[in-house]
Amino acid sequence: MNFIDEVKICIKGGNGGNGCVSFHREKFIDRGGPDGGDGGRGGSVIFRSNHHLNTLVNYRYKQHFTAENGENGKGSNRSGKSGKSLALDVPIGTQIFSEDGNILLHDFTEDDQSFEIIKGGSGGLGNSHFKTSVNQAPRKRTEGEIAEEMWIHLSLKLLSDVGLVGLPNAGKSTFLSVVTAAKPKIADYPFTTLVPNLGVVYVDDEEFVIADIPGLIEGAHQGHGLGDKFLKHIERCNVLIHLIDGSSNDVMADYNTVRLELESYSDYLKNKIEIICLNKCDVLTDEEIQEKINELQKATNKEVFPISTYTNLGVNKIVKLALKTIKNQE
Protein backbone atom coordinates (compact mmCIF):
# COMPACT_ATOMS: atom_id res chain seq x y z
CA MET A 1 0.00 0.00 0.00
CA ASN A 2 1.26 3.49 -0.83
CA PHE A 3 2.26 5.63 2.13
CA ILE A 4 0.50 8.98 1.68
CA ASP A 5 0.81 11.56 4.48
CA GLU A 6 -0.23 14.81 2.77
CA VAL A 7 -3.43 15.47 0.79
CA LYS A 8 -5.75 18.33 -0.08
CA ILE A 9 -9.45 17.62 -0.41
CA CYS A 10 -12.68 19.57 -0.87
CA ILE A 11 -15.55 18.87 1.52
CA LYS A 12 -19.12 20.14 1.46
CA GLY A 13 -22.05 19.74 3.81
CA GLY A 14 -25.46 18.70 2.56
CA ASN A 15 -27.86 21.49 1.61
CA GLY A 16 -31.07 21.85 3.55
CA GLY A 17 -34.26 20.77 1.79
CA ASN A 18 -36.74 23.42 0.62
CA GLY A 19 -39.94 24.14 2.47
CA CYS A 20 -43.18 23.07 0.78
CA VAL A 21 -46.18 25.10 -0.40
CA SER A 22 -49.24 22.91 0.10
CA PHE A 23 -52.84 23.25 1.23
CA HIS A 24 -55.03 20.80 3.03
CA ARG A 25 -57.32 19.00 0.61
CA GLU A 26 -60.18 16.87 1.84
CA LYS A 27 -63.58 15.90 0.50
CA PHE A 28 -66.24 18.49 1.31
CA ILE A 29 -63.58 20.98 2.46
CA ASP A 30 -63.01 23.54 -0.29
CA ARG A 31 -60.44 25.73 1.34
CA GLY A 32 -58.15 23.85 3.68
CA GLY A 33 -55.38 25.74 5.38
CA PRO A 34 -51.69 25.63 4.53
CA ASP A 35 -49.98 22.36 5.41
CA GLY A 36 -46.60 22.59 3.70
CA GLY A 37 -43.90 20.82 5.69
CA ASP A 38 -40.35 21.94 6.37
CA GLY A 39 -37.31 20.78 4.47
CA GLY A 40 -34.94 18.31 6.09
CA ARG A 41 -31.54 19.36 7.43
CA GLY A 42 -28.55 18.54 5.26
CA GLY A 43 -25.94 16.07 6.43
CA SER A 44 -22.80 17.22 8.22
CA VAL A 45 -19.19 16.31 7.40
CA ILE A 46 -17.46 14.47 10.25
CA PHE A 47 -13.90 13.17 10.52
CA ARG A 48 -13.12 10.15 12.71
CA SER A 49 -9.80 8.69 13.80
CA ASN A 50 -9.39 4.99 13.09
CA HIS A 51 -6.51 2.92 14.48
CA HIS A 52 -6.82 0.45 11.61
CA LEU A 53 -5.54 3.09 9.15
CA ASN A 54 -1.94 4.26 8.78
CA THR A 55 -2.00 6.29 5.56
CA LEU A 56 -4.14 8.89 3.79
CA VAL A 57 -4.14 6.90 0.56
CA ASN A 58 -7.98 6.85 0.51
CA TYR A 59 -7.90 10.55 -0.32
CA ARG A 60 -5.24 10.47 -3.00
CA TYR A 61 -7.44 9.79 -6.01
CA LYS A 62 -10.74 11.25 -4.83
CA GLN A 63 -10.71 14.89 -3.80
CA HIS A 64 -14.36 15.91 -3.50
CA PHE A 65 -16.62 14.70 -0.70
CA THR A 66 -20.21 15.86 -0.12
CA ALA A 67 -22.73 14.96 2.56
CA GLU A 68 -26.31 14.12 1.57
CA ASN A 69 -28.82 16.92 1.00
CA GLY A 70 -31.97 17.14 3.08
CA GLU A 71 -35.22 16.26 1.32
CA ASN A 72 -37.82 18.89 0.47
CA GLY A 73 -40.85 19.27 2.71
CA LYS A 74 -44.16 17.66 1.72
CA GLY A 75 -47.86 18.26 2.13
CA SER A 76 -49.84 17.30 5.22
CA ASN A 77 -47.16 19.02 7.31
CA ARG A 78 -44.65 16.28 6.57
CA SER A 79 -41.06 17.36 7.00
CA GLY A 80 -38.43 16.25 4.54
CA LYS A 81 -35.99 13.57 5.63
CA SER A 82 -32.65 14.84 6.93
CA GLY A 83 -29.62 14.06 4.81
CA LYS A 84 -27.11 11.48 6.02
CA SER A 85 -23.93 12.88 7.49
CA LEU A 86 -20.67 11.96 5.79
CA ALA A 87 -18.11 10.27 8.05
CA LEU A 88 -14.52 10.31 6.78
CA ASP A 89 -12.02 8.04 8.56
CA VAL A 90 -8.39 9.08 8.99
CA PRO A 91 -5.40 7.55 10.82
CA ILE A 92 -4.57 8.53 14.38
CA GLY A 93 -2.07 11.37 14.16
CA THR A 94 -3.88 13.16 11.33
CA GLN A 95 -4.03 16.94 11.53
CA ILE A 96 -6.63 19.00 9.68
CA PHE A 97 -5.45 22.39 8.44
CA SER A 98 -7.00 25.21 6.47
CA GLU A 99 -6.26 25.05 2.74
CA ASP A 100 -3.14 27.22 3.08
CA GLY A 101 -1.88 25.07 5.95
CA ASN A 102 -1.64 27.99 8.36
CA ILE A 103 -4.59 27.25 10.68
CA LEU A 104 -4.82 23.97 12.61
CA LEU A 105 -8.48 22.97 12.80
CA HIS A 106 -8.11 19.65 14.62
CA ASP A 107 -5.48 17.14 15.72
CA PHE A 108 -6.41 13.47 16.16
CA THR A 109 -4.23 12.00 18.90
CA GLU A 110 -6.44 9.10 20.05
CA ASP A 111 -8.55 6.38 18.49
CA ASP A 112 -12.23 6.93 17.73
CA GLN A 113 -12.20 10.71 18.07
CA SER A 114 -14.81 12.64 16.07
CA PHE A 115 -14.72 16.17 14.71
CA GLU A 116 -17.65 17.82 12.95
CA ILE A 117 -15.99 20.20 10.54
CA ILE A 118 -19.07 21.34 8.56
CA LYS A 119 -22.69 21.37 9.68
CA GLY A 120 -25.41 20.54 7.22
CA GLY A 121 -27.65 23.34 5.97
CA SER A 122 -30.91 24.05 7.81
CA GLY A 123 -34.13 23.01 6.15
CA GLY A 124 -36.43 25.65 4.68
CA LEU A 125 -39.82 26.48 6.21
CA GLY A 126 -43.08 25.27 4.72
CA ASN A 127 -45.97 27.65 4.07
CA SER A 128 -47.79 26.57 7.22
CA HIS A 129 -45.39 28.85 9.13
CA PHE A 130 -46.62 31.93 7.29
CA LYS A 131 -50.35 31.79 7.96
CA THR A 132 -51.62 34.97 9.61
CA SER A 133 -54.98 36.48 10.46
CA VAL A 134 -54.90 38.48 7.26
CA ASN A 135 -53.31 35.81 5.06
CA GLN A 136 -55.01 32.47 5.56
CA ALA A 137 -53.54 30.93 2.41
CA PRO A 138 -49.88 31.93 2.21
CA ARG A 139 -47.91 30.79 -0.78
CA LYS A 140 -44.67 31.69 0.86
CA ARG A 141 -42.00 29.20 1.86
CA THR A 142 -38.24 29.39 2.26
CA GLU A 143 -35.48 27.49 0.56
CA GLY A 144 -33.06 25.28 2.41
CA GLU A 145 -29.73 26.68 3.54
CA ILE A 146 -26.75 26.09 1.24
CA ALA A 147 -24.10 24.28 3.27
CA GLU A 148 -20.50 25.40 3.53
CA GLU A 149 -17.86 24.10 1.14
CA MET A 150 -14.13 24.26 1.79
CA TRP A 151 -10.76 22.93 0.77
CA ILE A 152 -8.67 21.53 3.59
CA HIS A 153 -5.18 20.11 4.02
CA LEU A 154 -4.76 16.76 5.78
CA SER A 155 -1.35 16.00 7.24
CA LEU A 156 -0.43 12.75 8.97
CA LYS A 157 2.12 12.70 11.78
CA LEU A 158 2.67 9.16 12.97
CA LEU A 159 2.37 8.58 16.69
CA SER A 160 5.33 6.80 18.24
CA ASP A 161 7.12 6.75 21.58
CA VAL A 162 10.60 6.46 20.10
CA GLY A 163 12.08 7.84 16.89
CA LEU A 164 15.05 6.22 15.14
CA VAL A 165 17.41 8.68 13.45
CA GLY A 166 20.73 8.44 11.68
CA LEU A 167 22.44 8.74 8.33
CA PRO A 168 21.50 6.32 5.54
CA ASN A 169 22.95 2.87 6.27
CA ALA A 170 23.39 3.55 9.99
CA GLY A 171 21.44 0.33 10.59
CA LYS A 172 18.09 1.76 11.64
CA SER A 173 15.95 -0.68 9.67
CA THR A 174 17.92 -3.63 10.98
CA PHE A 175 17.55 -2.30 14.52
CA LEU A 176 13.79 -2.03 14.01
CA SER A 177 13.57 -5.58 12.67
CA VAL A 178 15.59 -6.93 15.60
CA VAL A 179 13.57 -5.30 18.38
CA THR A 180 10.11 -5.59 16.79
CA ALA A 181 8.13 -7.83 14.47
CA ALA A 182 8.28 -5.17 11.75
CA LYS A 183 9.76 -6.26 8.44
CA PRO A 184 11.25 -3.18 6.78
CA LYS A 185 13.18 -3.51 3.54
CA ILE A 186 16.86 -3.94 4.39
CA ALA A 187 19.85 -3.81 2.06
CA ASP A 188 23.40 -2.49 2.06
CA TYR A 189 22.79 0.70 0.10
CA PRO A 190 21.58 4.19 1.01
CA PHE A 191 17.89 5.04 1.26
CA THR A 192 16.65 1.46 1.59
CA THR A 193 13.90 2.94 3.76
CA LEU A 194 11.73 5.13 1.54
CA VAL A 195 8.79 5.56 3.91
CA PRO A 196 8.44 5.58 7.71
CA ASN A 197 8.14 2.18 9.37
CA LEU A 198 6.45 1.54 12.71
CA GLY A 199 7.01 -1.36 15.07
CA VAL A 200 5.91 -2.34 18.57
CA VAL A 201 8.61 -3.25 21.08
CA TYR A 202 7.61 -5.61 23.90
CA VAL A 203 9.61 -5.42 27.13
CA ASP A 204 8.43 -7.89 29.78
CA ASP A 205 4.77 -6.90 30.28
CA GLU A 206 5.10 -3.46 28.71
CA GLU A 207 5.37 -2.11 25.19
CA PHE A 208 6.15 1.00 23.18
CA VAL A 209 5.99 2.09 19.55
CA ILE A 210 9.12 2.91 17.60
CA ALA A 211 9.35 4.73 14.25
CA ASP A 212 12.12 4.41 11.67
CA ILE A 213 12.28 7.24 9.14
CA PRO A 214 14.40 7.44 5.97
CA GLY A 215 18.02 8.33 6.63
CA LEU A 216 18.99 11.97 6.92
CA ILE A 217 21.64 13.66 4.83
CA GLU A 218 23.17 17.11 4.99
CA GLY A 219 20.55 19.65 3.93
CA ALA A 220 17.60 17.37 4.69
CA HIS A 221 15.70 20.19 6.43
CA GLN A 222 16.00 22.17 3.16
CA GLY A 223 14.53 19.36 1.11
CA HIS A 224 17.64 17.37 0.18
CA GLY A 225 17.40 13.60 0.20
CA LEU A 226 14.29 12.01 1.72
CA GLY A 227 14.46 12.89 5.38
CA ASP A 228 12.85 16.33 5.55
CA LYS A 229 9.54 15.00 4.28
CA PHE A 230 9.39 12.52 7.15
CA LEU A 231 10.97 14.41 10.06
CA LYS A 232 7.48 15.46 11.16
CA HIS A 233 6.74 11.81 11.97
CA ILE A 234 9.13 11.83 14.93
CA GLU A 235 8.07 15.22 16.33
CA ARG A 236 5.55 13.58 18.65
CA CYS A 237 7.89 10.93 20.09
CA ASN A 238 9.30 11.04 23.63
CA VAL A 239 12.86 10.02 22.89
CA LEU A 240 15.24 9.67 19.94
CA ILE A 241 17.59 6.75 19.41
CA HIS A 242 20.45 8.10 17.32
CA LEU A 243 22.34 5.35 15.51
CA ILE A 244 25.85 6.05 14.23
CA ASP A 245 27.66 3.74 11.84
CA GLY A 246 30.69 2.57 13.80
CA SER A 247 32.50 1.60 10.59
CA SER A 248 32.48 5.24 9.43
CA ASN A 249 35.81 7.03 9.16
CA ASP A 250 34.39 10.12 10.91
CA VAL A 251 31.71 9.27 13.46
CA MET A 252 31.76 12.81 14.86
CA ALA A 253 30.93 14.34 11.49
CA ASP A 254 28.14 11.80 11.02
CA TYR A 255 26.68 12.70 14.40
CA ASN A 256 26.87 16.43 13.75
CA THR A 257 25.21 16.10 10.35
CA VAL A 258 22.13 14.48 11.84
CA ARG A 259 22.02 16.84 14.83
CA LEU A 260 22.15 19.88 12.53
CA GLU A 261 19.20 18.59 10.53
CA LEU A 262 17.15 17.91 13.66
CA GLU A 263 17.91 21.31 15.16
CA SER A 264 17.25 23.13 11.89
CA TYR A 265 13.90 21.43 11.40
CA SER A 266 12.23 22.34 14.70
CA ASP A 267 12.81 23.06 18.37
CA TYR A 268 10.66 20.02 19.15
CA LEU A 269 13.33 17.74 17.70
CA LYS A 270 16.23 19.82 18.94
CA ASN A 271 15.21 19.43 22.57
CA LYS A 272 14.21 15.77 22.61
CA ILE A 273 16.04 13.30 24.83
CA GLU A 274 18.63 11.45 22.76
CA ILE A 275 20.12 8.00 23.26
CA ILE A 276 23.34 7.78 21.23
CA CYS A 277 24.37 4.35 19.94
CA LEU A 278 27.55 3.38 18.12
CA ASN A 279 26.29 0.61 15.85
CA LYS A 280 28.12 -2.12 13.91
CA CYS A 281 30.60 -2.66 16.73
CA ASP A 282 30.94 -6.28 15.59
CA VAL A 283 33.28 -5.11 12.80
CA LEU A 284 35.47 -3.03 15.16
CA THR A 285 38.22 -3.96 17.58
CA ASP A 286 37.80 -3.15 21.26
CA GLU A 287 40.34 -0.35 20.88
CA GLU A 288 38.47 1.17 17.93
CA ILE A 289 35.17 1.00 19.80
CA GLN A 290 36.57 2.75 22.84
CA GLU A 291 38.32 5.40 20.76
CA LYS A 292 35.16 6.32 18.88
CA ILE A 293 33.00 6.27 22.00
CA ASN A 294 35.46 8.56 23.79
CA GLU A 295 35.42 10.97 20.86
CA LEU A 296 31.62 11.13 20.81
CA GLN A 297 31.22 11.37 24.59
CA LYS A 298 33.77 14.17 24.86
CA ALA A 299 32.02 16.24 22.18
CA THR A 300 28.42 15.59 23.25
CA ASN A 301 28.82 15.24 27.01
CA LYS A 302 26.41 12.30 26.76
CA GLU A 303 26.84 8.59 27.33
CA VAL A 304 27.38 6.61 24.13
CA PHE A 305 26.35 2.95 23.97
CA PRO A 306 28.15 0.34 21.81
CA ILE A 307 25.72 -1.97 20.01
CA SER A 308 25.54 -4.41 17.14
CA THR A 309 22.27 -5.28 15.48
CA TYR A 310 24.08 -8.20 13.84
CA THR A 311 25.13 -9.89 17.10
CA ASN A 312 22.51 -8.19 19.34
CA LEU A 313 25.30 -6.67 21.45
CA GLY A 314 23.78 -4.03 23.74
CA VAL A 315 20.42 -3.96 21.93
CA ASN A 316 18.35 -5.19 24.87
CA LYS A 317 19.97 -2.60 27.12
CA ILE A 318 18.94 0.19 24.74
CA VAL A 319 15.37 -1.08 24.56
CA LYS A 320 15.06 -1.09 28.35
CA LEU A 321 16.65 2.35 28.60
CA ALA A 322 14.19 3.71 26.04
CA LEU A 323 11.24 2.30 27.99
CA LYS A 324 12.56 3.77 31.24
CA THR A 325 12.99 7.16 29.58
CA ILE A 326 9.44 7.07 28.20
CA LYS A 327 7.98 6.20 31.60
CA ASN A 328 9.92 8.99 33.29
CA GLN A 329 8.22 11.51 31.00
CA GLU A 330 4.69 10.30 31.61
Curated annotation (Swiss-Prot):
PROSITE patterns listed in its UniProt record: G_OBG, GTP1_OBG, OBG
Localization terms from the record: Cytoplasm
Main location: cytoplasm
Class in the EC hierarchy, top level: hydrolase
Cellular component GO terms held in the UniProt record: cytoplasm
Classification via InterPro entries: G_OBG (IPR031167), GTP-bd (IPR006073), GTP-bd_Obg/CgtA (IPR014100), GTP1-OBG_CS (IPR006074), GTP1_OBG_dom (IPR006169), GTP1_OBG_dom_sf (IPR036726), OBG_GTPase (IPR045086), P-loop_NTPase (IPR027417)
Domain Obg: 1-159
Record: residues binding GTP: 166-173, 191-195, 212-215, 279-282, 308-310
Cofactor(s) needed: Mg(2+)
EC number: 3.6.5.-
Gene3D superfamilies tied to this protein: GTP1/OBG domain (2.70.210.12), P-loop containing nucleotide triphosphate hydrolases (3.40.50.300)
Protein's UniProt keywords contain Magnesium: yes
Keywords assigned by UniProt, alphabetized: Cytoplasm, GTP-binding, Hydrolase, Magnesium, Metal-binding, Nucleotide-binding
Binding site for Mg(2+): S173, T193
Any Pfam family the entry gives: GTP1_OBG
Highest taxon listed in the record's lineage: Bacteria
Domain OBG-type G: 160-327
Molecular functions (GO terms): GTP binding; GTPase activity; magnesium ion binding
GO biological process, one term: ribosome biogenesis
Keyword Hydrolase (UniProt): yes
Assembly: Monomer.
Function of the molecule: An essential GTPase which binds GTP, GDP and possibly (p)ppGpp with moderate affinity, with high nucleotide exchange rates and a fairly low GTP hydrolysis rate. Plays a role in control of the cell cycle, stress response, ribosome biogenesis and in those bacteria that undergo differentiation, in morphogenesis control.
The family this protein is said to belong to: Belongs to the TRAFAC class OBG-HflX-like GTPase superfamily. OBG GTPase family.
Name of the featured protein: GTPase Obg
